């Protein structure tokens, strides 16, 4: 789809918005929509592809990565809300917070370059599009699956060796239940496992929504590794990407809190 005329049409339509908000081309809007539809790490992959094809600069790519590293509705509503917490309402609250958090987060990392690239159009490659797409998809699936398996194995070992005992002990002194602490720490490493553990703690709906929103927007180190395999192509330091994910997580959790208080 990245090679079709649909992308060029979307780019032209979204240029006024993305240029005004983030000082990047309209193609950033396409990356954003693909990311919120497909989830991690699609946004990172498309951003890296655009940079490698010289459609965006390194500075623009760094800005785009701040608001296009997102989860998708299938995971948020289907897996987390319905599958783990048995609550559709929770899913919609988290999804809205997650998307708004990403949009706001992008403003914090607005491109500061002089940019007149918002009218870029994507050029169709001369190679076989089907072959390239199939190859890229297979590599992406293997990459994602590999990091998930490795992260799950590392987390299982850490839990088995009780390596979270120290932070659990520290937070317990502030009245925080050990199961909640363990769930959050697990989610920071592998988000799906952490959220599943959180759903079994029996905490309130409001607290579940806020913590889940934070963890999903942060993504977990497993997702960080997946995304960074692509993002490093335009010299984005991991420390900068980590900062982007932390601010996204804080903003999303804050938006979740506001939504809960209002509605």
Which residues make up each language-model segment?
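N-terminal signal-anchor module of multipass membrane proteins
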Residues: 1-12, 20
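Intrinsically disordered, low-complexity non-transmembrane regions of multi-pass membrane transporters
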Residues: 112-135, 169
């Amino acid at each position: 789809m990245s090679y079709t005329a649909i992308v060029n049409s979307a780019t032209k339509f979204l240029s006024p918005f993305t240029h005004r908000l983030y000082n990047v081309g309209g193609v950033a809007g396409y990356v954003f929509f693909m990311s919120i539809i497909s989830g991690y790490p699609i946004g990172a992959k498309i951003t890296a592809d655009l940079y490698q094809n010289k459609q965006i600069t390194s500075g623009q790519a760094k800005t785009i990565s701040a608001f296009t590293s997102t989860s998708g509705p299938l995971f948020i509503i289907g897996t987390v809300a319905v599958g783990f917490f048995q609550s559709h309402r929770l899913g919609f609250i988290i999804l809205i917070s997650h998307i708004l958090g990403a949009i706001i987060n992008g403003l914090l990392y607005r491109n500061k370059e002089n940019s007149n690239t918002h009218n870029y159009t994507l050029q169709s490659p001369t190679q076989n599009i089907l072959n390239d797409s199939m190859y890229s998809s297979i590599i992406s699936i293997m990459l994602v699956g590999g990091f998930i398996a490795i992260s799950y194995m590392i987390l299982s070992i850490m839990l088995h060796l009780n390596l979270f005992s120290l932070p659990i002990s520290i937070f317990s002194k502030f009245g925080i239940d050990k199961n909640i602490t363990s769930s959050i720490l697990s989610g920071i490493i592998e988000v799906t496992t952490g959220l599943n553990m959180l759903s079994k703690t029996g905490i309130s709906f409001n607290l579940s929504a806020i913590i889940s929103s934070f963890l999903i927007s942060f993504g977990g180190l497993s997702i960080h590794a997946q995304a960074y395999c692509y993002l490093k192509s335009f010299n984005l330091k991991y420390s900068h990407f980590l900062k982007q994910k932390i601010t996204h997580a804080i903003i999303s959790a804050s938006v979740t809190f506001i939504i809960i208080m209002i509605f």
